[in-house]
Amino acid sequence: MAKEFSRTRRIGQQLQQELAVVLQRDMKDPRIGFVTVNDVDVSRDLSYAKVFVTFFEEDKEVVQEKLNALIAAAPYIRTLVAGRMKLRVMPEIRFVYDSSLVEGMRMSNLVSQVINSDKAKQQQFGSADDVTENDIDEADDTEGKA
């Protein structure tokens, strides 16, 4: 029977927590700003860790600048995290921008716009939901006479 949580997954979760703390408390680089660590994928041999991050910025150039600053600081961040974790070999950290949060917000906004548009059209033209029982009775009467 396989373990419910593999060692790489547990290390990834701990690495995510430690990275979040280090990025929030120990990094003083103003180029980075506020960073959210969404997920960490650790390779099976524990040599690499792909760190998915997001920023509270929508401008692609600003996001790329922040990501480049993180990539440049990766060896220093790795050293800080290695001091906090009890691993024989600390994985090499590779930062990747996670656009899923931004895409999810964009999709949510699109759905909200469509819902608001539908509500406006229903108010303007009426809807099938506005049919009363009198309308149904009148329709039945006209069908019976024909």
From Swiss-Prot:
Keywords recorded for this protein, A-Z: Cytoplasm, Ribosome biogenesis
Highest taxon listed in the record's lineage: Bacteria
GO cellular component: cytosol
Its biological purpose: One of several proteins that assist in the late maturation steps of the functional core of the 30S ribosomal subunit. Associates with free 30S ribosomal subunits (but not with 30S subunits that are part of 70S ribosomes or polysomes). Required for efficient processing of 16S rRNA. May interact with the 5'-terminal helix region of 16S rRNA.
One Gene Ontology term from the biological process aspect of the record: maturation of SSU-rRNA
Keyword Cytoplasm among record annotations: yes
Molecular function in Gene Ontology: ribosomal small subunit binding
Bias (Acidic residues) ranges: 130-146
PROSITE patterns assigned to the protein according to its UniProt record, in alphabetical order: RBFA
Region described as Disordered: 121-146
Subcellular location as annotated: Cytoplasm
Principal subcellular localisation of the protein: cytoplasm
Pfam families: RBFA
Protein name, entry field: Ribosome-binding factor A
InterPro entries, sorted: KH_dom-like_a/b, RbfA, RbfA_dom_sf, Ribosome-bd_factorA_CS
Classification lineage: Bacteria, Pseudomonadati, Pseudomonadota, Gammaproteobacteria, Alteromonadales
Protein family (similarity comment): Belongs to the RbfA family.
The protein's assembly and partners: Monomer. Binds 30S ribosomal subunits, but not 50S ribosomal subunits or 70S ribosomes.
The organism of origin for this protein: Shewanella sp. (strain MR-4)
